[in-house]
Swiss-Prot record:
It comes from Desulfovibrio desulfuricans (strain ATCC 27774 / DSM 6949 / MB). Rubredoxin is a small nonheme, iron protein lacking acid-labile sulfide. Its single Fe, chelated to 4 Cys, functions as an electron acceptor and may also stabilize the conformation of the molecule. Electron acceptor for cytoplasmic lactate dehydrogenase. The lineage of its organism: Bacteria, Pseudomonadati, Thermodesulfobacteriota, Desulfovibrionia, Desulfovibrionales. GO terms for molecular function: electron transfer activity; iron ion binding. Signal peptide: none annotated. This is Rubredoxin-1. SUPFAM superfamilies: Rubredoxin-like (SSF57802). It is found in: Cytoplasm.
């Protein structure tokens, strides 16, 4: 599955570490657990 990286702090969202939930299926109000920015601040890894 595709990983995504926060453009602000570099946090990497890896679906394998989150019950195999793809990034695009996360809730719209999901935010970076490190710096708190929204999903639109992430890019494919």
């Amino acid at each position: 599955m595709q990983k995504y990286v926060c453009n602000v702090c570099g946090y990497e969202y890896d679906p394998a570490e989150h019950d195999n939930v793809p990034f695009d299926q996360l809730p719209d109000d999901w935010c970076c657990p490190v710096c708190g920015v929204s999903k639109d601040q992430f890019s494919p890894a």
